[in-house]
Amino acid sequence: QQLTGALPEIVPELPHCKGGRHVSGIAALGIPTLRVTNGPVGLGQNDCVSASIPPIYFNLGGERVDITAYTDASSAKATALPSAMGAAASFDPAVAAAYGDVIGTEMLNLALHVFEAPGMNLSRLPILGRNFEYFGEDPYLAGVMSVAEIKAVQAKGLIGMAKHFVANEQETNRTTVQETVDRQVLRELYLLPFEMSVKDGKVASIMCA
């Protein structure tokens, strides 16, 4: 799943688990083991439990969704932090740094390497279902807070991930909608937090939208 187009002899080495966020190391290719967790308001639990565990399903709009990786008792526990928008309301990057410090500490305790956060999309829609993940509607503030969190996480030798690149400002049809944004607006608003994360935060990875 994580190595698209992987050679057949490599595929069996991928982890047999539910959640699928972890990538086993492949010594022959010099690839270390990477254990990935979701965010952004704390660790997304273990995200990977044994495939032998009976599935736990949730009915989501008529579709059965396997939520075993998030609900089974073997999934690691972590602190549920306040919303990112709440942290941004402080207008204080020290708050975001403290946020990242807690996350980084718990990642080390749980032997996790990659944090799929911070989220730096803008709260363009008041009813956006994921506004709690983002630092509000101001791109500069979002960038400042993201940089502080990234630095705190990566100071512990971990990998931060700026997401979702770019213009991922709505949930409805987000996997199929075509976003058309004026070039100036794109650069001044939607790209700014990502640019700051790369230039100022030296973020180690980026998640595409």
Question: Where do the protein language model's features map onto the residues?
Answer:
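Glycoside hydrolase catalytic-domain context in secreted enzymes
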Residues: 1-209
